[in-house]
Each structure stands twice: as structure tokens, then as C-alpha cells.
């Protein structure tokens, strides 16, 4: 805020010494059209993920800026003849207190971090426009979720292998033996699926709030929050997929062990049956020899 006010005062002192109305008007249109291009690019560029689309959109905004700058002479001539110096200083004032101030940063990171927004999980009520978001109190740190700076999880790679062809960096997977104690029962698996469904529903609700958000600053904060929630959900899905793989591997081991145990039992039964047959044959021969002796 201090830098913005300082820039406005400096610009006002410069415009004060402008005596030519056309020069002042031209410079005002230059900065106003540049502000329109910058504001449009800054508002809609977050929807483009690929660099080539981002670059093409930048040049599109630049062409629109040049067209506005080329058309300013006709507007200047019309309004300068009608209003004279009043129009000139009016355009300069618009540039001073709106255009050039908006081109500067909004302040330090601490200024951005002061605005914290949390969703009410119980009611979903809102104190600002009914969009499901409420401004949290400073004395309630348990429910306060600051959207800037980002949580430290954003700087860490996904701790499990990603899908084939994924550009996300991943860390080496943990040893498979560490997951043997994490094999859940059917109830815990169902609870995990419910948790993933709730997270997905919360992300969809935040996306609807983002579509209805009119403030560009809160929109950017909400978009950053959505990105973080999506990364968290992807991490949970990756962990569940890894646990499923480990569970399947353990079931295969148990199935192989069961098959081997069944084979051993069949071999033992075969040996026992063979011994019984040999014993029965020996007893029959002994009884036959005894009957001959008698």
C-alpha cells in the first residue's frame, strides 16, 4: 500500500507540470490501455497451463493494447475540443488513482497473509456473499487456514510413484515391507473411500465458489487453495493405490503359501495312505503265515 501511494504522489507531481493537454492525454491513454492489457492478462492467464497457449494469449493482449493505443487519437481529438484541459487532467487522474496504482504489487507477503478464509464444515454458511467462505477470527487458530503463504507440502514431491508419463517429480518408493502393517480391513477401506469422496466434494464446492468470486485477489487465493487441495487428494489417491498394490502382493504371497500348504497336505495324506496300505499288506501276510503254521 505504501508503494502504491508513493507512486500515485510521484505521478501527480509529474502531471502537475504538464502544460500541453494533448501530451497529458496521450500519456494517460498509454498507461490506461497498458493497465487494461495487464489486468486482463493477469486475470485470465491462470486458466492456461501450457506455455505455448500462455505465450499466444500474451501476444493477443499485446495486439489489443496496440489497437487501443492506435485509436486513442480520435477519442482525444473529440473530447479535447469538447472539454479542453478538463478532459486532459481527468484522464490523468484516472491514470493516477486507478491505472498505475493497480499495476504495482499489492504489498508485502504479510499484507497478503492477513486475509485468511476458511470454509465452515458444519453449515457452509458465509458472512461475505453467501459463497461458503467466512473470514476467520485471529484468535481462532484451530480453524484458520491461511491461503498465502502455501503449506510446506507443496514443496515436497509426491512420496509414491506417479502414473507412467507423469511429469511430476517423485521420490523413491518406501520398502514394501513397511506397508505390511498397513493392510486394512474392509471397514477401513470403506472409510478411506468415503474420505476421498468428501475431499472431492469439497474441491468441487470451492470450484463453484471460484466461479462466483468477483474479487481477483480472493479468486487467486482460492485458486491456489484449490491447487493445494487437488495435490493433497492426488497424494491420498497415490497412497491408497500403493496400499492396494501391497495388499494384492500380500494376498498373492498368502495364496501361494496356501497352495503350497495344500500340496504338502496332499503329499502327507498320500504318504499316510501308502503307509496304511503297506501296514495292511504286512498284516495280511503275517496272518497268512500264521495260518499255515497252524
UniProtKB/Swiss-Prot annotation:
Residues 184-215 form a coiled coil. Residues 156-176, 265-294 are annotated as: Disordered. Keywords: Coiled coil, Membrane, Mitochondrion, Transmembrane, Transmembrane helix. Residues 265-277 have a biased composition (Basic and acidic residues). It comes from the Eukaryota. A stretch of 270 kb of the mitochondrial genome is duplicated within the centromere of chromosome 2 resulting in the duplication of the gene. The expression of this duplicated gene (At2g07698) is not demonstrated. This is Uncharacterized mitochondrial protein AtMg01200. It comes from Arabidopsis thaliana. The lineage of its organism: Eukaryota, Viridiplantae, Streptophyta, Embryophyta, Tracheophyta.
Amino acid at each position: 500500500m505504501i508503494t502504491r501511494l508513493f507512486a500515485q504522489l510521484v505521478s501527480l507531481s509529474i502531471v502537475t507540470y504538464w502544460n500541453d493537454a494533448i501530451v497529458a492525454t496521450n500519456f494517460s491513454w498509454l498507461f490506461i490501455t497498458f493497465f487494461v492489457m495487464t489486468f486482463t492478462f493477469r486475470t485470465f492467464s491462470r486458466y492456461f497451463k501450457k506455455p505455448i497457449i500462455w505465450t499466444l494469449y500474451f501476444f493477443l493482449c499485446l495486439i489489443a493494447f496496440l489497437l487501443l493505443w492506435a485509436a486513442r487519437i480520435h477519442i482525444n481529438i473529440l473530447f479535447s475540443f469538447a472539454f479542453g484541459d478538463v478532459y486532459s487532467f481527468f484522464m490523468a487522474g484516472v491514470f493516477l488513482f486507478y491505472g498505475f496504482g493497480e499495476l504495482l504489487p499489492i504489498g508485502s507477503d504479510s499484507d497478503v497473509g492477513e486475509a485468511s478464509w476458511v470454509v465452515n464444515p458444519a453449515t457452509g454458511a458465509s458472512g461475505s456473499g453467501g459463497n461458503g467462505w467466512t473470514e476467520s477470527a485471529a484468535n481462532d487458530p484451530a480453524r484458520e487456514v491461511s491461503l498465502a503463504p502455501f503449506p510446506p507440502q507443496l514443496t515436497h514431491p509426491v512420496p509414491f510413484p506417479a502414473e507412467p508419463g507423469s511429469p511430476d517429480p517423485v521420490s523413491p518408493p518406501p520398502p514394501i515391507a513397511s506397508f505390511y502393517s498397513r493392510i486394512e480391513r474392509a471397514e477401513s477401506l470403506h472409510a478411506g473411500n468415503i474420505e476421498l469422496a468428501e475431499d472431492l466434494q469439497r474441491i468441487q464446492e470451492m470450484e463453484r465458489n471460484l466461479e462466483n468470486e468477483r474479487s481477483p485477489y480472493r479468486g487467486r487465493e482460492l485458486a491456489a487453495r484449490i491447487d493445494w487441495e487437488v495435490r493433497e487428494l492426488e497424494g491420498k489417491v497415490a497412497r491408497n493405490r500403493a496400499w492396494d498394490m501391497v495388499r494384492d502382493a500380500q494376498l498373492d504371497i498368502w495364496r501361494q503359501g496356501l497352495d503350497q500348504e495344500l500340496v504338502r497336505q496332499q503329499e502327507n495324506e498320500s504318504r499316510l495312505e501308502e503307509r496304511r496300505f503297506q501296514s495292511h499288506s504286512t498284516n495280511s501276510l503275517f496272518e497268512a503265515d500264521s495260518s499255515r503254521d497252524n
